[in-house]
Design a protein with these regions (language model features):
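Structured alpha/beta reader/binder surfaces that contact nucleic acids or chromatin modification marks
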Residues: 2-155
Length: 155
């Protein structure tokens, strides 16, 4: 068994993968940096609708290899969990109804071993693309997170 950091989030897999992070958590960074994996589970009851995922409430939908823990750029009293690789999963009822949206939980090593992890594509602010086709090929079109300029080809 491997112990993982588990979060209950309203954000979609697409947003998390695009950012390469799950953001703005109250956690102990010294404890969190000892974990290898982040498991994201769906919070369907959050009122915010932007980037809302489609999975069922409490379903695990993403397992990520943690890169590091850093201060949140949006809230300096919170932390973001950065990851370098991810695998999409579907594990029903994974969240255990805890009231705290972050917890530590064991996951079977066989589940981890059988996953097909993909590397995060990293785009730096100010990346210039030749044309709109490159933006589409990188799945960055209509991206509200980075404010893509589709006419100028700038991310």
């Amino acid at each position: 068994m491997t112990t993982a950091l588990v979060v209950l989030t309203y954000k979609s897999a697409e947003e998390l993968i695009l950012k390469g992070a799950s953001d703005a958590w109250r956690l102990n960074p010294e404890k969190a940096k000892n974990f290898k994996y982040l498991i994201c589970t769906r919070n369907k009851h959050d009122k915010r609708k932007i980037w809302h995922g489609k999975e069922k409430h409490r379903e695990a939908f993403l397992i990520c290899k943690i890169k590091d823990i850093s201060k949140s750029i949006h809230n300096p009293s919170r932390y973001q969990i950065n990851f370098k690789e991810y695998a999409k999963v579907s594990i029903k009822e994974y969240w255990s109804k805890d009231r705290n949206p972050i917890m530590y939980k064991n996951i079977d090593d066989e589940i981890i071993k059988n996953l097909n992890f993909k590397k995060i594509d990293e785009f730096n602010e100010g990346t210039v693309f030749k044309d709109r086709k490159q933006i589409l090929n990188n799945n960055l079109h209509n991206n509200l997170v980075f404010g893509i300029s589709q006419t100028d080809g700038i991310a």
